[in-house]
Amino acid sequence: DSYGNETIEEVTFTFIEEETQEVKVNSSYSTLDEVVAAVLQDITDNSMSKGQKARAIYKYAHSKIGYTGNSYTNSSEWQDEAFEALKVIKKNGYVAGDCFTYASVDRALLDGIGAECIWVDNQGARSGDHSWLLCNLGTGWYHFDSTRMRSGFSCFMKTDAEIQAYLDQGNYNYVRTVSKYPATPTTPYTY
């Protein structure tokens, strides 16, 4: 400072480089369907509409997965990623992964409530590749992505217009070849 005082602290940092953090978890779940059923039993009930169940799935994945930029497993199959990630969440309450982890868990749980899903990939955007879903709960296709966004954007059942408004703010996560996918309804989703 201006009086000549100084403080010195010694700090040690340890950096661990890893491509994936996959750890096979011993669990009583032998199939993806079994762990999906267990999670859905925890977060939904029969009194809920399909939209309410989808919202519970969104909140579950959004809060139980932390973004690291690396998938949880080395597998390129979403079913493998979802199975391993969900087992870890059931055991530890949390798992780290990337958009592939979020989309895989979203897809498995949405399939479990009977929703239709289409996988969407954003290839080559400035922010890097990104994956999310188009989801149809019976009222048309909407964008569904529980990935935590730096901007705080919540992508629960968004229309194409809502996604475009997000893109117009300078965000690139959802750039895609629009003609490859079904159009969403023009009205925001309600449940």
For the regions a protein language model found, what residue spans apply to each?
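Conserved active-site-adjacent core of cysteine acyl-enzyme catalytic domains
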Residues: N74-I113, D121
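Extracellular adhesion/carbohydrate-binding repeat motifs centered on closely spaced tryptophans
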Residues: I16-E18, N122, G128-D129, L133-C135, ...
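Secondary-structure boundary elements
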Residues: N26-N92, T186-Y189
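Low-complexity, Pro/Ser/Thr- and charge-rich linker/hinge segments at domain boundaries
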Residues: E17-S27
